[in-house]
Amino acid sequence: MNLPDDFQFSQGSLQDLVDCRRRFFLRCIRRLAWPAVQSEPVIEHERYVQQGSDFHRLAQQALVGLPIERLSASLVGEDLARWWGNFLDYLPGLTRAEPGPGWQLYAEISLTAPLGDARLVGKYDLVAAHPQGRVLIYDWKTTRQRSRRSVLEKRLQTRLYPYLLVRAGAFLNAGAPIQPEQVEMIYWFAEHPQQPERFVYSSAAYQADEAFLTSLIETVMRLDEADFYLTDDDRLCAYCVYRSLCNRGVTAGDLATLEGDRDEDPLTTIDLDFEQIAEIEYS
């Protein structure tokens, strides 16, 4: 399958490919805009996504040194105000304690690197690098539920971001190559600020991720259109804009039902689209 000339594999497109080949084909190859609601109620969903986007923007501005008082005065919405308050409580740890003195902070930074005949790209909420070697990846999550570690460790973001940092992040490390053992990825949940999830990287994980990503991309290149089949997990379809096109239903999934179902992780549904929005918006 020929990909668009300007196409780069992001964590969102890779997750699409793993979750549902058909969604990857429609969104990433055909780039089909489909006029469907992602989640009900529409206004509540749109408000929640917008506040998530606003939070990422505010966090970036705070980390580059804009006055906190000015940023705080711009808040609109209860969710955003709560997330922002939690972030401000956490912020001293990013600027003084941990990472602390000597750390360099890179907010909303993009990295890209070739892999075979394709390119990988990642948009990082924050990379913190210390001259003595540690490099931390922070990713802000605004979902109401805290995702389980067992789910996060399977996410393509958890595999791509540390791998890509090792491949392309030497300029963040005074020009020296970053070794996998220097890297740690931290998911910080705005609704659960005292319960971050941390993943320490390793050379073994780096090699496994390179093999996995290479195989995944090579598989895509060999596929014909008929090979981009629908997912067997039709729970994902309720929150996919292409559900009616694929004859997987017309009515959007209910946001309250999703958030109340402890067996369903929010990262597999609505949060996925927000991550893709964020990758584009801050580029």
Predicted features along the sequence, with ranges:
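Anion-coordinating catalytic cores for phosphoryl-, nucleotidyl-, and glycosidic chemistry
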Residues: 1-8, 14-15, 114, 118, ...
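Metal-dependent nuclease catalytic regions and adjoining charged, substrate-binding loops involved
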Residues: 9, 165-283
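Active-site catalytic microenvironments for nucleophilic, acid-base chemistry
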Residues: 32, 61-65, 164-171
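Short, polar/flexible loop-turn hinges at active-site or ligand-entry regions and domain interfaces
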Residues: 35-44, 69-70, 147-150, 171, ...
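A non-catalytic, helix-rich entry segment at domain boundaries
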Residues: 39-110, 114
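Mg2+/Mn2+-dependent nuclease catalytic core
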Residues: 103-105, 109-215
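A residue-level signal for conserved active-site and pocket-lining positions in enzyme catalytic cores
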Residues: 20, 55-56, 126, 185, ...
